[in-house]
Design a protein with these regions (language model features):
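Acidic, PIN/NYN-like endoribonuclease modules and their adjacent C-terminal/linker elements
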Residues: 1-2, 19, 25, 111-161
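Active-site neighborhoods of divalent-metal-dependent phosphate/nucleic-acid chemistry enzymes
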Residues: 73-131, 154
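Short, well-structured N-terminal submotif of metal-dependent ribonuclease cores
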Residues: 1-44, 53-65, 90-96, 130-133, ...
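Short, catalytically relevant binding-site loops at active-site mouths
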Residues: 13, 48-51, 80-82
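Non-catalytic, well-ordered alpha-helical scaffold segments
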Residues: 29, 46, 102-106
Length: 161
């Protein structure tokens, strides 16, 4: 059976250090273990790395170690993904101010991944955004993409899965 391919955005990786939300830390850690043990294929992008490099030094080093130990593959951004991200912004799916969110989604789409995993409920894990993203994808000849929360992958919700 084909392994699911997950693009994990920076909000999830940052959740590892959320001192105010232990449940979030546990979910993020569990997701990284599931990627590390080969249950899922995990992907990040150069954009993710750029965002990590903007984090405070102590967190930056810990994040880099977590990513390395979890076995993420790194995807490149290219003209095709930039064009698709522009289309998301132009369609009103993602505000111009948050273009990086559109870039993350576009990278996952052009690399034909199965899911984008994020805790960004305002600009990504949101039914209205998903509809606009997927209508843009279909209009431009791409597959639709599921944008989900980490809990949907790990089963760490309120209900036992």
């Amino acid at each position: 059976m084909k392994k699911l391919r997950l693009y994990v955005d920076t909000s999830v990786l940052g959740g590892i250090f959320d001192s105010e939300e232990p449940k979030r830390v546990n979910t993020a850690e569990r997701l990284l273990r599931l990627i590390g043990d080969g249950t899922y294929e995990g992907y990040i992008s150069r954009l993710t790395i750029e965002e990590i490099l903007a984090a405070p030094g102590k967190i930056q080093k810990k994040l880099q170690a977590k990513i390395t130990n979890s076995g993420f593959s790194v995807l490149e951004e290219n003209a095709e993904s930039v064009n698709l991200a522009d289309a998301y912004v132009n369609a009103g799916a993602i505000p111009e101010k948050y273009r990086a969110d559109a870039r993350h989604i576009a990278i996952g789409v052009i690399h034909d991944l199965d899911y984008i995993v994020s805790w960004n409920y305002k600009h990504m894990v949101n039914i209205s955004v998903r509809r606009l993203i997927n209508s843009t994808n279909i209009r431009m000849g791409y597959n639709s993409i599921e944008i989900i929360s980490p809990e949907e992958v790990t089963g760490d919700g309120e209900v036992e899965i």
